[in-house]
Amino acid sequence: MAANVPPSAETLSSGAAAHPSNTAEEIANQYNLLPKLIPYLDRHLVFPLLEFSSGQDDEKEIVRAKYELLKHTNMTDYVANLWKEINNSDDIPDEFVKKREEVLAKLQQYEEESAKITQLLQDESVVANLRSDKVANLKFLEEQHGVTVEMVNSLYDYGRFQYSCGSYGNAAELLYQFRVLSTDNDKVASATWGKFASEILTTSWEAAMEEVQKVKDSIETRLFNNPLGQLQNRSWLIHWSLFPFFNHDPARDVLTDLFFSPAYINTIQTNCPWILRYLAAAVITNRNRAHKNSSVYQKQLKDLIRVVRQEGYEYNDPITDFIKALYVDFDFEEAQKKLGEAEEVLRSDFFLVSTTDAFVEAARHLISESYCKIHQRIDIKDLSTRLGLNQDEGEKWIVNLIRDTRVDAKIDYKEGTVIMNHPPQSVYQQVIEKTKGAFFRTQVLSAAVAK
């Protein structure tokens, strides 16, 4: 209905940012990505991001931004309430009353126009006769039940109108029904984007992930000869995918692979390098997942380091700076500093707030592992400081690290040190490793020349 309210930030994200200190607030503001994200999101998808910001920014400005965002939608009751809040008034202008009446009348009209076809699509005996061939389906419905192309298109119009009213569940169903029957490729593509947004806004993450694949396939086929169109549509898909990326655990691996695929990592580097923040957060937190020691994770980390190094001149924030400090510059003090800043940025980011603790935990492990690899004798107090822990916490951390990673090390509690046993690599083994690397590079060059 017209009175519907978009889903809240709490509904779409599984955490909330605490009120930061002044320094933390400055860091959060400096690296706020909202202005960069908005151009790539539908206005309904922007709403929860604005609501999330209401705890961090000026409340009046946020209310005004919500009003400007939604005033052209059909959510008339909610928009009217925003107007009253902005103007500190209990009364609303006649234009809101008039628009509400128009919206309700239009809803009634669409419902009547689509009544016949929606009833048919709910009839199991009719649905049982439908096949994967849309042309055959439309012919069957036309001959047996008098369905016209106009009736099918009414599902599309009704679905879009329901979406504009904030009735996302109804919109998803209507757009799905339209897509089953329509042969209009442009409208089908539009309906797929609409259904994707509707599934996001109803937090139907499994259904949303199905739409990710459908949108991706549509981009590859419909825009095959339009590189600029592909770039723009892939950019939108990347941004919209952030919703399931950090709210639906099974989506994490699928979307990480998608973002690292050649077409999409090229899109990120070309059009939206700020997405590296989200890719970095995903890869770092993936360390805590089941495949943390697998070749898949190691490849993701290597790819991330490569892209962060390449794009450092174009985009950086404390999350990407942490990667650079640890794996490019091997600067542990800088890595510790950037980890502290990254924590504040994560807590102020709508998509990443719920991953903050996991990120910090995983990042500390990565610092420890890297530090232990290049030092023979490690001062527990020094390493604890680098991890942002006191000595007792650091000692427990190191004990757990040795146990979990099964490294060959022993703790000298009297001296307060950890002694790492790094077995020397034979010259023979070093030659083998270097030969493997040279052979791989030769294969890559040969493949490139062959193209």
Curated annotation (Swiss-Prot):
Any one cellular component term from GO for this entry? Answer: eukaryotic 43S preinitiation complex
SMART domains from the entry?
Answer: eIF3_N, PINT
| Domain annotation PCI: ranges | 256-425
GO MF annotation terms: translation initiation factor activity
Q: Which PROSITE patterns match?
A: PCI
Q: Which CDD domains match?
A: eIF3E
Regions of compositional bias (Polar residues) in chain numbering: 10-21
Q: Kindly report the protein's main subcellular placement as a broad class.
A: cytoplasm
Q: Where in the cell is it found?
A: Cytoplasm
**Region Disordered: what ranges?**
1-21
Record key words, sorted: Cytoplasm, Initiation factor, Protein biosynthesis
Fill in the subunit field for this protein: Component of the eukaryotic translation initiation factor 3 (eIF-3) complex.
Which family is annotated? Belongs to the eIF-3 subunit E family.
The record describes the protein's role as: Component of the eukaryotic translation initiation factor 3 (eIF-3) complex, which is involved in protein synthesis of a specialized repertoire of mRNAs and, together with other initiation factors, stimulates binding of mRNA and methionyl-tRNAi to the 40S ribosome. The eIF-3 complex specifically targets and initiates translation of a subset of mRNAs involved in cell proliferation.
Which HAMAP family would you find in this protein's record? eIF3e
Its recorded name reads Eukaryotic translation initiation factor 3 subunit E
